[in-house]
Curated annotation (Swiss-Prot):
Disulfide bonds join C39-C77, C73-C120, C111-C129. GO terms for cellular component: extracellular region. GO terms for molecular function: odorant binding. Gene3D superfamilies: Pheromone/general odorant binding protein domain. This is General odorant-binding protein 57b. It comes from Drosophila melanogaster (Fruit fly). One of its GO terms (biological process) is response to odorant.
């Protein structure tokens, strides 16, 4: 009887794992390799350093925003160069450009109330706030 349960439960578990997608705050970027490399170079970050910093294992570290300023400036650079614009001409969030849902807009706005004035830290915080708000919605296709 136990084996029959496994026959039905195992495929269900596999299905759930296949539907689950790992999310990371940097999943928002539509990477252009040249822009990515230029942003790293401008901020004096090697590929190895970036890979170590951007791993899923460092997610709590990122969400606590205890990140060196050069990494925050790299995120600002990526936001400025990304094909999906989140920042207005003044370097501040633009919820219309971000195409947020009402729920995400409220959450992001509340989270950004205590955003730092410094533009690199501000941009980094915006990405973290959007991630916490579940924005953008990742398509399952």
């Amino acid at each position: 009887m136990f084996i029959y349960r496994l026959v039905f439960i195992a495929p269900l578990i596999l299905l759930l794992f296949s539907l689950a997608k790992a999310r990371h705050p940097f999943d928002i970027f539509h990477w252009n390799w040249q822009d990515f490399q230029e942003c790293l170079q401008v901020n004096n970050i090697t590929i190895g350093e970036y890979e170590k910093y951007a791993r899923h294992e460092t997610l709590d570290y990122l969400l606590n925003e205890k990140v060196d300023l050069r990494y925050k400036c790299n995120i600002k650079c990526q936001l400025e160069r990304d094909s999906t614009k989140w920042l207005n001409a003044q370097g501040r969030m633009d919820l219309d450009l971000m195409n947020t849902t009402d729920k995400a807009s409220k959450s992001i706005t509340k989270c950004m109330e205590k955003a730092p004035e410094e533009l690199c830290a501000y941009s980094f915080r915006l990405v973290m706030c959007a991630f916490k708000a579940g924005h953008p919605v990742i398509d399952s296709e």
